[in-house]
């Protein structure tokens, strides 16, 4: 007999929301299942770009954990978690991220509000993920193209020239992704437009290659 947990994660990976809903209807406890890496079903779905499935799973859960609440931008649930256990603002997920990394990367719901709440509770704006990605929340926000979260993190003192593996700065990611507002905020906060990644590429070169002419002009000014 197929393990129901395996069936759930198989359905998530296949993007089969109907199958997920059927499995959860038959066994609501499956919503609390975790994959082989200890990642919850809702987060597993988000990592695979399956937001609708993540929302379906979240709707069945009696309570979201701090990472799920942060990732889905559910500030009411997040505030309740932080009020009960303030230390959750600095705890790590099974895969090495802080809760602040999740609204920064996913940008779902009230991601900016979730970020502010976590920072107010003591989250480290410059915390690096304890995994091979070794990213700070600002890297996550610029990679995800979430200008509002970028602004929150910069206002909280994020290191605008911090490097992630391969030498990428937040400005590299924002320029490549065409996030004009984020590029503007990063420059205003002192980001170095001449910074090169490990293969010698600057932000303006990435913007030019991607056809982001307005950002090229901004970086040239």
Task: Please report, for each region that a protein language model flagged, where it lies by residue.
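Ankyrin repeat A-helix N-terminal signature
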Residues: 10-15, 44-50, 68-74, 102-111, ...
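Ankyrin repeat domain, specifically the short helix-to-loop turn at the C-terminus of the second helix
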Residues: 22-29, 55-62, 82-88, 116-124, ...
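Alpha-helical adaptor scaffolds
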Residues: 127-131, 135-155
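N-terminal segments that cap or nucleate solenoid repeat domains
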Residues: 2-33, 72-95, 99
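Ankyrin-repeat boundary/"N-cap" motif
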Residues: 2-10, 33-40, 63-68, 91-105, ...
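Ankyrin-repeat and related helical/solenoid repeat scaffolds used for protein-protein interactions
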Residues: 161-202
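Conserved ankyrin/ankyrin-like repeat signature
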Residues: 19, 52-53, 77, 110-114, ...
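Leucine-rich solenoid repeat scaffolds
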Residues: 37-58, 193-221
């Amino acid at each position: 007999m197929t393990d129901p947990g395996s069936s759930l994660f198989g359905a998530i990976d296949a993007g089969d929301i109907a199958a997920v809903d059927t499995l959860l209807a038959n066994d609501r406890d499956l919503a609390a299942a975790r994959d082989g890496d200890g990642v919850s079903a809702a987060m597993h779905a988000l990592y695979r770009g399956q937001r609708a499935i993540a929302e379906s799973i979240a709707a069945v859960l009696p309570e979201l954990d701090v990472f799920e609440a942060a990732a889905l931008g559910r500030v009411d649930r997040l505030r309740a978690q932080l009020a009960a256990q303030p230390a959750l603002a600095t705890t790590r997920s099974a895969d090495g991220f802080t809760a602040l990394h999740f609204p920064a990367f996913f940008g779902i719901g009230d991601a900016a509000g979730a970020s502010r709440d976590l920072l107010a509770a003591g989250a480290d704006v410059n915390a690096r993920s304890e995994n091979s990605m070794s990213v700070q929340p600002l890297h996550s926000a610029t990679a995800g193209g979430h200008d509002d979260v970028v602004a929150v993190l910069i206002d909280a003192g994020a290191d605008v020239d911090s490097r992630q593996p391969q030498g990428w700065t937040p400005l590299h990611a924002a320029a490549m992704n065409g996030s004009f507002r984020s590029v503007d905020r990063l420059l205003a906060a002192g980001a170095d437009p001449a910074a090169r990644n490990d293969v010698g590429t600057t932000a303006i070169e990435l913007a030019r290659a991607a056809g982001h002419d307005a950002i090229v002009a901004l970086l040239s000014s």
